[in-house]
Amino acid sequence: MIQSSLYRALNKGFDYQILACKDFKESELAKEVISYFKPNTKAILFPEFRAKKNDDLRSFFEEFLQLLGGLREFYQALENKQETIIIAPISALLHPLPKKELLESFKITLLEKYNLKDLKDKLFYYGYEILDLVEVEGEASFRGDIVDIYAPNSKAYRLSFFDTECESIKEFDPITQMSLKEDLLEIEIPPTLFSLDESSYKDLKTKVEQSPLNSFSKDLTSFGLWFLGEKAQDLLIVYKSIISPRALEEIQELASLNELDCERFKFLKVLENAQGYEDLEIHAHALEGFIALHSNHKITLLAPNKTILDNAISALDAGNMECVIAPFVLNFKTPDGIFISLNSFERKKKRQKSKLALNELNPGEWVVHDDYGVGVFSQLVQHSVLGSKRDFLEIAYLGEDKLLLPVENLHLIARYVAQSDSVPAKDRLGKGSFLKLKAKVRTKLLEIASKIIELAAERNLILGKKMDVHLAELEVFKSHAGFEYTSDQEKAIAEISKDLSSHRVMDRLLSGDVGFGKTEVAMHAIFCAFLNGFQSALVVPTTLLAHQHFETLRARFENFGVKVARLDRYASEKNKLLKAVELGQVDALIGTHAILGAKFKNLGLVVVDEEHKFGVKQKEALKELSKSVHFLSMSATPIPRTLNMALSQIKGISSLKTPPTDRKPSRTFLKEKNDELLKEIIYRELRRNGQIFYIHNHIASILKVKTKLEDLIPKLKIAILHSQINANESEEIMLEFAKGNYQVLLCTSIVESGIHLPNANTIIIDNAQNFGLADLHQLRGRVGRGKKEGFCYFLIEDQKSLNEQALKRLLALEKNSYLGSGESVAYHDLEIRGGGNLLGQDQSGHIKNIGYALYTRMLEDAIYELSGGKKRLEKSVEIQLGVSAFLNPELIASDSLRLDLYRRLSLCENTDEVGQIHEEIEDRFGKIDDLSAQFLQIITLKILANQLGIIKLSNFNQNITITYSDEKKESLKAPSKDDNDILETLLKHLRAQISLKRR
């Protein structure tokens, strides 16, 4: 009722400075009313901020920055004597917040002089994290004369200094790291946390460090807010405030859970609801009927543009309507009239880069070399070769063997990724055994690729059941989803529709994480088949999945006349059901492999979920069932981009990488384990009638943990699940847990990644330090998939037992709930879920031997080779030039940044890409020096040589030798033996050769 009540209040006179609402959704609706009816009032929207007092704010970092940004905006508007109002979820107003003096910003002006040490100190006291690389808000870096600052709720800026003078200010893109062209004259730098000086910073730091709070990071980011004392204020008391009735209910509920003292809210005025005023929720398909029903009311219709407005008017009786082009979302009814909007809220997608660099090479990590196999990356080292300095990666192999890999050949290695429980073994250098192993794997991969291509070719010859995909009912079906489709879902639906309406049978793989909306996309296809008179089968590997899909489909198709049935080992009257399927009395049949023997009257579509989990015989039966019908396979296992491209030569691939708009990242807490904390975590979830995953990765002691939990919380209903429990019993336990008959699932790992358990929204991970970064991220992703917020607790037995690297990793996970869906994550997901079954045949043995990256690359090559595509060039050019060439540490001080650039340069496929990286280096680090420029020339030579079939470039003094793959040699003479002359002579010659070749 927020919009209609607020509209009424505005008409009666409204001079409040704060409006507290139930949640962000209600706040958003209220802001629309203020913005439309009081356009001169600055309406500032606060985020939800569900931190409880003394919570570690790293887990709420993004919202905390937004909250401080909104508050700073409010103080500035008051200072400028501008009429303003804060509209906030009540959760954002429950704690005292910083006064104006703690949120002061400062300016940096072009051509002014600044002491860089003082600037660095100031940013540090303002809460900025000083790092090598700036990627997210609240970070800054100082690299010689170049300073990067990413201001919260603002933009990322790059400043260039000449001595102390600021000679350039530009924005830069934190994802590409490249600055934009336009120069700025002045920028404003707000604090990330609070505007403190050295003295006030030290005072606050001391208060935090001396507090008894349980945390691994007793710093201002985590706890500063709770110790501001008189420098913070209760906004609801200081400024004239009013709350919505639903916000009052929220306060009362929190009070009933003893999380809040109700007394401090008693003085607040409550926004009144009144008769004749109500908020509306009208779906597009019901609009015409609604307007006809209210023809005696004055109706105001809002639309984002003239086209949408004209289309609406032509379909409606516009006699009593006032039409307005405005972007606001207003849907409410008053005694005087009705407001209806054709607009919807636009969720701004944050372009964000993952801070958790999963593919970063760190010393001590396992790597696999294309020719020499599995070893351990030791360090980045510099050696003199032929009297010149070059950089190498040192890789340790079996025994005392070491390989020095020139950095220009970094593309020959990849991080070793197999299954997370497999322990790699080092290979021995010089025995040739790894090359034999590769040859064996290649033979097997050619066999697999051949089968895939053969099947695709067979299916390609079959005429498909052509469907009409432009039916109006499909649009109505979409509008009843209850949520907005993501752009990925829209794209996948369009791709599937194109397949269904062609003359060929569809063969498409739909991949996407659990909760990303694969089932909705599949249901759209099933409904399309139904409208065209065809039956569909949805085949799943487990009874629990069958049960879940059946409930989902039954609810979704309830009003659309689709008859849905389920066939699994629990289904009663199987024969009767099979007869109904044969007679065409069932439109969509869902079930386990029990479906595979069913006879259909008019089967048009087969959808399979998690196909790789079926056995060999079941896969054969599946192939038979789907032989001449449209086939859609769904998988929660992501596919790395390059393999995706190779597979797309022979089958359709759609990927869902965007989470649903209302999905919130799970809150993550890193804590030292104790009994009180465990009780608090479990009760916190039970109070909201939820369930808990408790991960304890040690079967031998799992019963002890169960006993301990039962001692702490008597009557707690706990189920145990681990790999030694047989499949049927495991499934039974999961079914009981899904039904809510257990409160805690105590297990060694979440056995079934594809299962959606919307009521389990807290996960506790015992001894989190023993898990890999990707495992922890995966486990965290198991909660927070429904409407409720997820909570993830990484518990450590003893803080002192953690090394610095492990602590850093865990703190990074705590602060960064976002993880990019890039290539590295796909590999790591495969590591956890076991990528061995990716193509339906278990290949985990081969993957264990050669690692996932090399395996997929070889598979891509096999597919390209057999389907007549382009095979990658495997030859590496050997560079034996007496030239000093490396990325200079004086220019790029950080080893990890240099290593990243080396990796990217080694992967360049053309000289344009090298030129782009050259520009980027100058932009990010300053003018490039001779040594770094010479390394870029070496990379350019390597690319040109590859194009000409050259395998080696070498020199002795000014005499240069070029060796071709057919052993032919060519000699050149440079003007001198200087590095520059050698490189220029070679570049000029190779470019001329390529020009001749192109003629």
Swiss-Prot record:
ATP binds at G512, D513, V514, G515, F516, G517, K518, T519. The keyword Hydrolase applies. It is an enzyme of class 3 (hydrolase). Its EC number is 3.6.4.-. GO terms for biological process: DNA recombination; DNA replication; DNA replication initiation; double-strand break repair; regulation of DNA-templated transcription; transcription-coupled nucleotide-excision repair, DNA damage recognition. Residues 499-656 form the Helicase ATP-binding domain. The keyword Nucleotide-binding applies. CDD domains: DEXHc_TRCF (cd17991), SF2_C_TRCF (cd18810). It is found in: Cytoplasm. SUPFAM superfamilies: CarD-like (SSF141259), P-loop containing nucleoside triphosphate hydrolases (SSF52540), TRCF domain-like (SSF143517). Keywords: ATP-binding, Cytoplasm, DNA damage, DNA repair, DNA-binding, Helicase, Hydrolase, Nucleotide-binding. Its main location: cytoplasm. A motif (DEEH box) lies at residues 609-612. Pfam families: CarD_TRCF_RID, DEAD, Helicase_C, TRCF, UvrB_inter. Residues 677-833 form the Helicase C-terminal domain. GO terms for molecular function: 3'-5' DNA helicase activity; ATP binding; damaged DNA binding; hydrolase activity. One of its GO terms (cellular component) is cytoplasm. It comes from the Bacteria. NCBIfam families: mfd. Couples transcription and DNA repair by recognizing RNA polymerase (RNAP) stalled at DNA lesions. Mediates ATP-dependent release of RNAP and its truncated transcript from the DNA, and recruitment of nucleotide excision repair machinery to the damaged site. This is Transcription-repair-coupling factor. It comes from Helicobacter pylori (strain ATCC 700392 / 26695) (Campylobacter pylori).
